Amino acid sequence: MSDNLCGGLPPEICEQLNKEEQFIKIKVEKRRYGKEVTIIEGLSGSDVELKKIASELKSKLAAGGTVKNGKIELQGDHRERVKELLMKMGYPESNIIIIE
């Protein structure tokens, strides 16, 4: 996070404020051959930060996935579990929306 956006606040507080401002949408799409893909959108940050979050989610869910166009895509239907993991990462529950 850039220091000038947080007005001299410590980096930890700045990071938490940034997480509280994000509205995250979690949805599942059906792809070819009936395969399901969980898509997480609304996370702001650089590609490196998104890849770090995706990597952590993939290892905890034992699933493959990728980062494309600012969205995290995970193989399989992991909506509820992803919400739990994002809350453990510090994202507020009220900002995480599961789209059915």
Curated annotation (Swiss-Prot):
Protein biosynthesis is among the record's keywords: yes
Tree of life domain: Archaea
Gene Ontology terms, MF aspect: mRNA binding; translation initiation factor activity
Pfam families: SUI1 (PF01253)
UniProt xrefs under Gene3D superfamilies: SUI1-like domain
Keywords: Protein biosynthesis, Translation regulation
NCBIfam families to which the protein is assigned, alphabetical: PRK00939.1, SUI1_rel
UniProt record similarity statement: Belongs to the SUI1 family.
Protein name: Protein translation factor SUI1 homolog
Source organism per UniProt: Sulfurisphaera tokodaii (strain DSM 16993 / JCM 10545 / NBRC 100140 / 7)
Highest classification ranks of the organism: Archaea, Thermoproteota, Thermoprotei, Sulfolobales, Sulfolobaceae
